[in-house]
């Protein structure tokens, strides 16, 4: 199955000059969604993750069913102010701005092997911030899983050395 057939491109969103890769059309199609989760599981299952971390918010959509498929726990990494207990916070730069992410300080019992999942790898800033949060919370990142990689932004080069990185679709 070619997942590009299920991903809509929206020009000038969220800013002029950005080509937004919209995965809501993929989520709409049960066979494409199942294929996506099955493909991620097939390519990351051997990593032996104890937890899947999903990055807010589209990482939740793929991370939670992947965690179920891999028989792992799920840990959300959220935007600031959304988690109720004590958190670690990391700031990062996006393709089109700046932001921050947070994780509960007690998210993992060390040693925990963690797979970080998001819908998109662009500049790498979000994934790197999530990986730093995982480490601060006592986990070890064993891999990254993405639905889409924007290769022209070279975000993969910014990911930490060691953990594997999987992207199902490249633009």
Swiss-Prot record:
PROSITE patterns: PUR_PYR_PR_TRANSFER (PS00103). Transmembrane segments: none annotated. Its main location: cytoplasm. It catalyses: AMP + diphosphate = 5-phospho-alpha-D-ribose 1-diphosphate + adenine. Its EC number is 2.4.2.7. GO terms for cellular component: cytoplasm. Keywords: Cytoplasm, Glycosyltransferase, Purine salvage, Transferase. It is found in: Cytoplasm. Pfam families: Pribosyltran. Pathway: Purine metabolism; AMP biosynthesis via salvage pathway; AMP from adenine: step 1/1. Gene3D superfamilies: 3.40.50.2020. Disulfide bonds: none annotated. GO terms for molecular function: adenine binding; adenine phosphoribosyltransferase activity; AMP binding. Belongs to the purine/pyrimidine phosphoribosyltransferase family. Homodimer. Catalyzes a salvage reaction resulting in the formation of AMP, that is energically less costly than de novo synthesis. This is Adenine phosphoribosyltransferase. It comes from Gloeobacter violaceus (strain ATCC 29082 / PCC 7421). The lineage of its organism: Bacteria, Bacillati, Cyanobacteriota, Cyanophyceae, Gloeobacterales. The gene is apt.
